[in-house]
């Protein structure tokens, strides 16, 4: 068996197209563009790349992009003041504070300052609570993107056994909550789980988000399982001085056993920004009091 490749790049392009169409419809009804604000503190190179990409994608989707770039030595109080300003701005529907923040800042305090109804990253404790009890709220972009890929591939997930490897607040925990809501039987595992290969081998769905290069081997995978690889790890390439990206799953061996698998790159990665745009647009409709059909996006 050779696994089918789950093309996150193609799915993300389709999702962006739907977002663009609905952004146009929103502007016609609300008399303004949906707006996404991104706040960057410091000059971390990776964060700068992410922020540029998010701003470009926001504009391409037909939404307004607001970028606030602050120096690394910005006082926490000044960052909180920017967040409060964005909370009060009716042109801003979604707020994203790019992480990580400088060490002198309390990330949880900053996230808690964001209006939960503008928290399009889904990191606010209120949105985490809403997810846990099944109420509408914003879900972190990466796990929601994973769920979209799974439902597109498998349809109804009810009754399937799922293992989520990883327990972070950003991916692992919300991923488990989303799968529980789809009536999966969910096990949350991690690097210290006893007999981890045996645990994974029981799963119809494997979501790997543990941050360890190629940790999940092909002989861990149940034949016919669907594998979602969230990992993005840079490892030495074949040529000296070169690097390459790999996931948390040993793709070559897993692809011989699984029925479907996401590649790295080109799998989950493209979904994250596409879902961010989706969340920002949902926020715009809610903030404007305009009904958005649950299956529209």
Swiss-Prot record:
The keyword Transmembrane does not apply. SUPFAM superfamilies: Aminoacid dehydrogenase-like, N-terminal domain, NAD(P)-binding Rossmann-fold domains. The keyword 4Fe-4S does not apply. Pathway: One-carbon metabolism; tetrahydrofolate interconversion. CDD domains: NAD_bind_m-THF_DH_Cyclohyd. One of its GO terms (molecular function) is methenyltetrahydrofolate cyclohydrolase activity. It holds the Pfam family THF_DHG_CYH. Its EC number is 1.5.1.5, 3.5.4.9. NADP(+) binds at residues 166-168, 191, 232. PANTHER family: C-1-TETRAHYDROFOLATE SYNTHASE, CYTOPLASMIC, C-1-TETRAHYDROFOLATE SYNTHASE, CYTOPLASMIC-RELATED. HAMAP family: THF_DHG_CYH. Belongs to the tetrahydrofolate dehydrogenase/cyclohydrolase family. Homodimer. This is Bifunctional protein FolD. The gene is folD.
């Amino acid at each position: 068996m050779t696994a089918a490749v789950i093309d996150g790049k193609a799915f993300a392009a389709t999702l962006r197209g739907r977002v663009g169409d609905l952004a146009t419809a929103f502007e016609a009804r609300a008399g303004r563009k949906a707006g996404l604000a991104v706040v960057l503190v410091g000059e971390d190179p990776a964060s700068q790349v992410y922020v540029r990409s998010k701003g470009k994608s926001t504009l391409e989707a037909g939404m307004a992009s607001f970028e606030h770039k602050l120096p690394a030595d910005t006082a926490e109080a000044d960052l909180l003041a920017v967040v409060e300003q964005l909370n009060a701005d009716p042109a801003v529907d979604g707020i994203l504070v790019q992480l990580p923040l400088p060490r002198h800042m309390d990330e949880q305090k900053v996230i808690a300052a964001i209006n939960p109804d503008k928290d399009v990253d889904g990191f606010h404790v209120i949105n985490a609570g809403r997810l846990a009890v099944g109420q509408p709220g914003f879900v972190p972009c990466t796990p929601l993107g994973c769920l979209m890929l799974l439902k597109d591939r498998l349809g109804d997930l009810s009754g399937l056994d799922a293992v989520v490897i990883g327990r972070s607040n950003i991916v692992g925990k919300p991923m488990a909550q989303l799968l529980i809501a789809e009536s999966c039987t969910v096990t949350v595992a991690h690097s210290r789980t006893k007999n981890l290969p045996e645990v994974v081998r029981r799963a119809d769905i494997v979501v790997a988000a543990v941050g360890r290069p190629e940790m999940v081997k092909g002989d861990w995978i149940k034949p016919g399982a669907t594998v979602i690889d969230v990992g993005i790890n840079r490892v030495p390439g074949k040529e000296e001085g070169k690097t390459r990206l790999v996931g948390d799953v040993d793709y070559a061996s897993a692809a011989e056993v699984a029925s479907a698998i996401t590649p790295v790159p080109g799998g989950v990665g493209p979904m994250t920004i596409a879902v961010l745009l989706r969340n920002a647009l949902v926020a715009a409709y809610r903030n404007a009091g305009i009904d958005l059909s649950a299956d529209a996006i």
